[in-house]
């Protein structure tokens, strides 16, 4: 089967024909001549209407999908048209967009592989440059953002991840509906303005349709949600609550361990950090024996550990009423414990009591677990590339990997 036959089968365009195919001068590439079909009119690139021809430009080279390790190039002399609406402009061709050197099919091909491999690996695999892979991904992401639909967003989750040294963060907003999880928004820095930018994009009408919002306890997030999604049920992030409690327990353990060392007592808490921080089911056999020995002593660390473990019952309730009663009793006990880091946690939980109980009002359907999973995928995307140089490229890569954007149509799906 000849190459021209294959191209006519998988990449045929109305008004154009493939004329000749030959090896390039280096014998490592294939060049295919393209010409307009006889009697076909050129199309204006401005108004997309047929227009009479004006003249021809020098021959341009468009990169196509490689074939068996050979680079493939389409060679075509672009026509200029004399459009009555736009004047003399270059014609529109169906296989390329604007001044891109890559054909649309090749850009989509590279973008799909760039979702599976790092951009550098994609460039090396198909004998192209990193910049061209970047251009391909930017084209596909730009097209997808223009054509995506944002209707029927019922639940969102917001969180931040670090993307560069020096406390540089991204604000990420996800859709976390049961049937659809995707990235909706990437905001630069962890600020009130960056989160407000998401609501500017979706508009007041879509914001009014949001029923559930998951976030952590950072005050700017709480303020924006209260202002923009007052009708939504705001659910606090379980992951961050557990993390804060573990941090408080670790502070108690570290302070008590230092005091015991200063007073010359036996170092009972030495190498005990993960024994008290890990969940029981994740402990090793050695850590279980170590924990059992620790629980024999009347230490602040032991009392703080028991308070932390006791709080895990909170998440097992189904009724908001009973969960609220347990929370109140736990906070009462903790405030009488004389363990300041744990008392600080109790005060925080009391201040956000209503938002904590919203988890049960939502029937436990929404939590931060989905958000943390998507955050891990976002970090993996950046880690595969060992980081990106600019915020713009980072934003593009995250949309490409996580936003589930629609893709341009092509005459043939190669993979």
Kindly give the residue locations of the regions a language model identified.
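Active-site beta-loop-alpha junctions of metal-dependent nucleic acid enzymes
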Residues: 99-102, 182-206
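N-terminal alpha-helical interaction blocks
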Residues: 1-39
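Short, positively charged, Gly/Tyr-enriched micro-motifs
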Residues: 48-52, 57-167, 207-210
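Acidic, glycine-enriched active-site microenvironments
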Residues: 99-108, 120, 185-188, 211, ...
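Short alpha-helix plus adjacent loop in nuclease-associated cores
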Residues: 241-262
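Acidic/histidine-rich catalytic cores and adjacent linkers
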Residues: 41, 46, 52, 165-168, ...
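Short metal-coordination and nucleic-acid-contact micro-motifs, chiefly zinc-binding Cys/His arrays
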Residues: 37-41, 76-79
């Amino acid at each position: 089967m000849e190459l021209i036959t294959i191209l006519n089968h998988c990449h045929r365009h109305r008004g154009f024909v493939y004329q000749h195919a030959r090896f390039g001068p280096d014998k490592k590439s294939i060049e295919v001549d393209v010409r307009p079909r006889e009697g076909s009119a050129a199309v204006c690139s401005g108004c997309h209407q047929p227009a009479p021809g004006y003249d021809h430009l020098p021959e341009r080279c468009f990169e196509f999908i490689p074939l068996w390790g050979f680079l493939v190039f389409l060679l075509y002399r672009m026509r200029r048209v004399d459009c009555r609406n736009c004047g003399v402009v270059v014609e529109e061709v169906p296989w390329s967009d604007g001044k891109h050197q890559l054909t649309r099919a090749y850009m989509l091909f590279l973008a799909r592989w760039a979702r599976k491999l790092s951009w550098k690996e994609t460039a090396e695999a198909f004998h192209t440059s990193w910049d061209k892979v970047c251009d391909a991904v930017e084209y596909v992401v730009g097209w997808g953002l223009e054509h995506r639909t944002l209707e029927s967003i019922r639940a969102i989750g917001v969180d931040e991840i670090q993307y560069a040294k020096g406390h540089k963060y991204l604000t990420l907003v996800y859709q976390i509906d049961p049937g659809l999880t995707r990235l909706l928004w990437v905001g630069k820095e962890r600020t009130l303005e960056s989160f407000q930018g998401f609501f500017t994009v979706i508009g007041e009408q879509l914001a009014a349709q949001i029923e559930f919002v998951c976030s952590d306890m950072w005050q700017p997030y709480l303020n924006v949600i209260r202002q923009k999604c007052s009708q939504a049920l705001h659910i606090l992030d379980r992951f961050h609550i557990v993390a804060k409690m573990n941090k408080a327990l670790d502070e108690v353990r570290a302070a008590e361990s230092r005091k015991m060392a200063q007073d010359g007592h036996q170092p009972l808490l030495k190498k005990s950090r993960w024994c008290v921080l890990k969940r029981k089911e994740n402990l090793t056999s050695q850590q279980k024996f170590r924990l059992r020995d620790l629980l024999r002593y009347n230490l602040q660390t032991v009392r703080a550990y028991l308070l932390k473990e006791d709080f895990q019952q909170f998440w097992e309730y189904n009724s908001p009423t009973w969960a609220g009663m347990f929370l109140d009793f736990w906070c009462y006990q903790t405030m009488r414990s004389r363990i300041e880091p744990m008392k600080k946690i109790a005060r925080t939980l009391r201040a956000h009591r209503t938002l904590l109980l919203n988890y049960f009002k939502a029937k436990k359907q929404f939590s931060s677990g989905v958000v943390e999973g998507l955050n891990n995928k976002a970090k993996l995307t950046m880690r595969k590339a060992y980081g990106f140089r600019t915020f713009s490229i980072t934003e593009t890569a995250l949309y490409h990997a996580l936003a589930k954007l629609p893709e341009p149509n092509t005459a043939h799906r190669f993979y």
